[in-house]
Amino acid sequence: MTLKMDRKALKEEKKKQKLEKFLNKKTTQSKISKAPKPAKNKSSSGYDPMPVEQKWNNYWLSNNLFEPQERSNKFVMCMPPPNITGSLHIGHSMMIAIQDAICRYMRLINYEVLYLPGTDHAGIATQTVVMKQLEKEKKTYNRESFLEATWKWKENYGSRILDQFKRLGTSADFSRQKFTMDAGMNKAVTEAFCSLYEKGLIYRDNKIVNWCCKLQTTLSDIEIDYLSVGKNTILKIDGRDYEFGVIYVFKYPVKFVKDGYESEGHIEVATTRPETILGDVALCANPKDARYTKYDKIIPRNPITEEELSFVFDEAAEMDLESGVLKITPAHDPIDFEIGKKNNLKNIKIFDNQNKIIIEGNYYKLKRLDARDLVVQTLKNKNLFVEKKPYEQVLPMCSRSSDLLEPVIKEQWWCSCSEMAKKAIDAVKTEQIKIYPEESKDDWYRWFENPRDWCLSRQLWWGHRIPAYKTPDGVWTIARNKEQAIQSYKKNNPLNVHYQESDFVQDEDVLDTWFSSGLWPFATLGWPNKNQDLDKYFPTSLLETGKDILFFWVGRMVMMSLELTGKVPFKKVLLHGIVRDAYGRKMSKSLGNVIDPIHVIDGASIETLLDALKLGNLTKENLINAESAVKKDFINGITVCGADALRFTLLSYMNGINDIKLDIERVKGNRKFCNKIWNAALFVKKIVDEIISSDSLSYQDLLNLDLSNEDDKLLVWLIQERNKVISTTHKAFKEYKFMSAVQSIHQFFLYDFCDVYIEIVKKIKTKKYIQACFMVLIDSIKIFSPYMPFITEEIYSQFFDNSLMYTSYPEIIHNKFSTNFKSTLSKIKAIRADIEKYGKEKVDVILDGCECFDKIDIQFISILIPNINTIKFGEGYEVKKVN
């Protein structure tokens, strides 16, 4: 399939053309100019994306065209590394469509572009899916065998993800691809941890963490799903059904002391978690609450253990909520923990790692929610139960296991964020970093003005082991390796120099995944080593990512880069919205509602879509729901759309940080639009080759058309509309308004170039009109190429030997003339509306003689409305059917 038609070639003319091409071509590295072009396919009337995409992917990659080409201006972007938990989904395709469009555009405006790809080890996410897979296969495993299985998983899915990148047309430099657990990344992680520790920013402490019993690890905030629970809702937790969406009110026995007199009574306290009464150490009221501040002293007792409790005051207590008094359980609630720290309260831990009660007595070894029932019954027996009321609540759930998370105190490694956060705020305020869209800056400030310290420890096997070594005396030594740890410890602890190497045991925990990915912009360039790439390409130019990880990832990259390199990691941040399914849910592998971009590119039957769900790690319930949704939404499967149509569609949705509900029908529509581009190019190729054949000209000769002094009304209009598209797309890229860019070129090409200009050229084949037609086709495919790289490269290759990627973006043509051709088009639109009732029957048109139309306008109107029989001027406007 090709546009290229056989033509006679004269030897001398060929030599002349080659010389002209050499003189006119922009300077590129020799490997680009020498890159052999792929063979052209046989002609076909329709565009078939599959062979074209395969051909050009092979060509680009085999000729290393995605590697940076030396230029004075640099543009560097790191790809947010997708997790190796499975295949890419449409959300990743959105990311690639945006980033790759930017990179391809920057090449066209003569920038040296480095686009760095990679993948993330995704600690907890990967460990979860690999364990599920091993359990499916009924395999037993220890840490060593598990890690072996996980590396195999990485090789399988990591390579699959990279293949998907390439199928999407991603112009990243794959010779520099990184993985967050590569040896180089491991060195960077170790150096970063040790450096931050030496700066006093990393410490070990007992604090509240989110504990997942099913996975036996702490979680980061992004791994928590907050479930809104309605009143009196039954949920299956810890293996059985329990009631949630209720609040309990109990009476706490209290002594009130005022002016030396004591009185006894009760304070009613509301809680959604009666089981935690076992760990209560205090009650708390607001310092402005006169009901309690009037007493000299309040002495409560725990209604279960009957131990004496403290009574404290804190603004966290809301005066208008029930009695205005909170129960304080510092070991199992983050707010209570902070109140406990302020008031020097003790921490009573009541759950073990299996969420079972560890306090001796009637509740010992009970599951937490079974203990809840017993606590309620006990307080009923003591006449201390007041009521149970319906209550809407929010529950923290593990996004990986769907377990109800338990706040617990654990000794972990922490990173102090307060000082680093101030630097991150300052970097944005001083515009060292610009955030797009601008409204996201408010979220940035809000988050960094109240930063929480970062829990770094994870009780996992898959990840970067924490470079901390413990000796029998309980001392932790932070070091870059065991040998350094031994030397450091013995220097600081001379009394224990007898410790052997085996006495230094490395922490079993691994670091939070976000720690390694927080180093991504500079570690991918070789940090902590000093090298040419780091000097040349850091800081990077732009970080483009989803709005949902602005703080979890972007913020941490900024903090760590400023602290470890003294520089911002990137100069700009661009955020995009989240791609959601037809029901508004975020696409998630665990829900099974993801769309594989390859299914859209290559097409997929309903059977293929259903089989793909079964290959995942879905729960039985999620599998049933996912299958039902697929059968409803894709009963006939997905037709072949191609990568260009998918990319173009995704960019057409890109409007700030608004979320996106992808409609596959829209992708199919743009697949047809690709065919429109193809057929337009076919026509232009045909008429251009006729001139070349008759006049012995080259394609470059035909592009050497000076329209700056052209006064032909049609050409002046074409120049103006072309110029508008160039200006609009430049502005859109500058402001990252991709919806505006794709709409602009789509409307121009379809409605102005195809529906008007080409239709006129079919009837009026002057050389100048054909030359302009050729010029605008080439300009259009250059403008299309950042969004549709495959079809545009294929079309361009039919005329020229160099890659479209390393040409130049079209420039504005400055033409001083004006034209009334838009009035002609408006009249055509009005006539079409008036003759619609006559169908395809011939009509006579009378134009008002007062309107400014000439013979050329009449000719254009006749061409563009083929069912006009006659057209003439009269005293008024009229359309009538031919008798």
Swiss-Prot record:
Intervals of motif 'HIGH' region: 82-92
Top enzyme class: ligase
Residues that coordinate or bind ATP: K589
Region (Disordered) residue spans: 1-49
UniProt main location, coarse: cytoplasm
Compositional bias (Low complexity): 30-45
Pfam family membership, one: Anticodon_1
PROSITE patterns, A to Z: AA_TRNA_LIGASE_I
Motif interval(s): 'KMSKS' region: 586-590
Extent of Basic and acidic residues compositional bias: 1-23
CDD domains: Anticodon_Ia_Val, ValRS_core
A single cellular component GO annotation: cytosol
Record key words, sorted: Aminoacyl-tRNA synthetase, ATP-binding, Cytoplasm, Ligase, Nucleotide-binding, Protein biosynthesis
Residues of the signal peptide: none
Keyword Zinc appears in the UniProt entry: no
Coiled-coil region list: none
BP terms from Gene Ontology: valyl-tRNA aminoacylation
GO molecular function: aminoacyl-tRNA deacylase activity; ATP binding; valine-tRNA ligase activity
Membership in a protein family: Belongs to the class-I aminoacyl-tRNA synthetase family.
Protein name as catalogued: Probable valine--tRNA ligase, cytoplasmic
Organism: Vairimorpha ceranae (strain BRL01) (Microsporidian parasite)
